[in-house]
A protein has these predicted regions:
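A structured beta-alpha segment of the ubiquitous adenosine-cofactor-binding alpha/beta core
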Residues: 1-52
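Active-site-adjacent beta-strand anchor residues
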Residues: 11, 33, 137-140, 187-188, ...
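Conserved N-terminal glycine/acidic-rich loop preference
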Residues: 28-31, 69-73, 221
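Active-site-adjacent "lid/gating" segments in soluble enzymes
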Residues: 43-189, 193-196
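Aromatic-enriched alpha-helical interface/lid elements that frame and gate functional surfaces
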Residues: 173-232
Length: 232
C-alpha cells in the first residue's frame, strides 16, 4: 500500500529528528499516527503543539480502542478487536470454535473509516472555517459498526445469533456447494424470483410449489432439506 510514495525514517527520541518532523508538519495537510493514546503527548507532539505549528493540519489518530474510554490506554491489535467486537463469535460453523478472519479485517475497516474522516476534515479546511480537525479512529468501533443489526437484535430480544457457516440467518438458500468436477459453487437465491429461476435451472421446477419452500421464511426453516437437494 506504500507504492509510489516517498518515505523518511526519523528517530523521534532524537531532539534534532523531532524538529525535522515538526518542520514537515508545518507544511503538511494531514498527519496520521497510530501510537497508543498519550504517546504523542509524551513526545511533545500533542494536538495543541501540532496545530500551533500548522492550524490547518488534519490529524488522524488510529488506535485499538479510541482516544477516550476505559480501554484507551491499552494496546490494540486487529485480532483482539475481531474477537471482542463479536465478529469471531458469528464467524464459522455451529459445531466448531469461533473463527477469526484470514486477513487484517479490523485494520482495513479502520483505514476506510479513517480515509473518509480525513477527507471530510480536509473539506472543512478548504471550504469551512479553515481549521484542521482531529479524526479519532478506533479499530474496535470500525469493525463493531458492521455488526449493528446484531446489536439491535440482542438489545430487543436478549439473544445473539449463532454461527451459521456459509449460510445466512434470515435467507435461504445461501451456501457453497461441491460440484462433480471438484470445484465449488457459491449460490444465493433469497428473492422469490431468484429461487424460482434456480429451481428451473437445476431441473427441479416442482420445488417452486413445494410447501416447504414456498417463501423465503419457509426455506429458512427447511434450509437443511433444501441444502441437501441442491448439493445432490
Amino acid at each position: 500500500y506504500g507504492r509510489n510514495k516517498r518515505s523518511i525514517v526519523l528517530n523521534l527520541k532524537d531532539p534534532e529528528e523531532l524538529e525535522k518532523l515538526k518542520a514537515l508538519v508545518s507544511q503538511s495537510d494531514v498527519l496520521v499516527e497510530n501510537f497508543v493514546p498519550g504517546k504523542m503527548e509524551e513526545m511533545g507532539l500533542g494536538v495543541d503543539v501540532l496545530q500551533s505549528l500548522n492550524p490547518r493540519l488534519v490529524i488522524a489518530r488510529v488506535s485499538g480502542w479510541g482516544q477516550t474510554g476505559p480501554y484507551a490506554h491499552k494496546p490494540g491489535f486487529g485480532t483482539l478487536v475481531e474477537a471482542m467486537s463479536g465478529f469471531a463469535h458469528l464467524n464459522g460453523f455451529p459445531d466448531r470454535e469461533p473463527a477469526l478472519p484470514p486477513l487484517a479485517m479490523a485494520d482495513m475497516y479502520a483505514g476506510i473509516y479513517g480515509a473518509f474522516g480525513v477527507l471530510a476534515a480536509l473539506r472543512n479546511v478548504e471550504h469551512g472555517d479553515g481549521k484542521g480537525q482531529v479524526v479519532d479512529v478506533a479499530l474496535f468501533e470500525s469493525l463493531y459498526s458492521t455488526l449493528a443489526s446484531e446489536a439491535v437484535k440482542f438489545q430487543a430480544t436478549g439473544t445473539a445469533n449463532r454461527r451459521m457457516g456459509n449460510q445466512a440467518i434470515n435467507t435461504a438458500p445461501r451456501n457453497i456447494y461441491a460440484c462433480a468436477d471438484g470445484k465449488f459453487l457459491a449460490l444465493s437465491a433469497s428473492v422469490q424470483s431468484m429461487f424460482e429461476n434456480l429451481a428451473q435451472a437445476i431441473g427441479r421446477p416442482e420445488l417452486i410449489d413445494d410447501r416447504r419452500f414456498l417463501t423465503n421464511e419457509d426455506r429458512v426453516i427447511h434450509c437443511q432439506e433444501l441444502n441437501k437437494i441442491l448439493a445432490d
